[in-house]
A protein has these predicted regions:
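Viral virion structural and adsorption modules
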Residues: 1-91
Length: 91
C-alpha cells in the first residue's frame, strides 16, 4: 500500500536567549519539504513564534506583545534564530 504522506517530527532542547527567555523548536519533515516552528517563551509564557518554510524559503518571526522582551533579548533572538534554523536544515 502506498503512503499518502510521510512525516517526521523532531523536538529540540530550548535555545537560551536570556536567563528568562528561550525558544523551543520543532522540525517537521514531509514530502513537500521541511517546516521549522519555534515558540518564544519568557518566564514560561509564550510571547512569540518563529516559523520557517523550506518550500518558500521564508522565515516569519512574531513577538507579541513586543514590550515583553528587552531590546537585548530581541537582538539576541534575531542573532541566534537564523543559525539555529540553518543547523536544523543541515543535520
Amino acid at each position: 500500500m502506498k503512503k499518502k504522506t510521510e512525516k517526521t517530527s523532531v523536538s529540540y532542547d530550548p535555545v537560551v536567549i536570556s536567563e528568562t527567555t528561550n525558544v523551543q523548536f520543532t522540525k517537521s519533515v514531509k514530502s513537500t519539504g521541511t517546516t521549522i516552528y519555534g515558540k518564544i517563551l519568557k518566564d514560561g509564557v509564550e510571547v512569540g513564534q518563529v516559523s520557517y518554510e523550506e518550500a518558500g524559503d521564508y522565515m516569519i518571526t512574531s513577538v507579541k506583545p513586543f514590550s515583553k522582551l528587552t531590546k537585548e533579548e530581541v537582538a539576541e533572538l534575531y542573532a541566534q534564530v537564523p543559525t539555529c534554523i540553518d543547523e536544523m536544515l543541515h543535520e
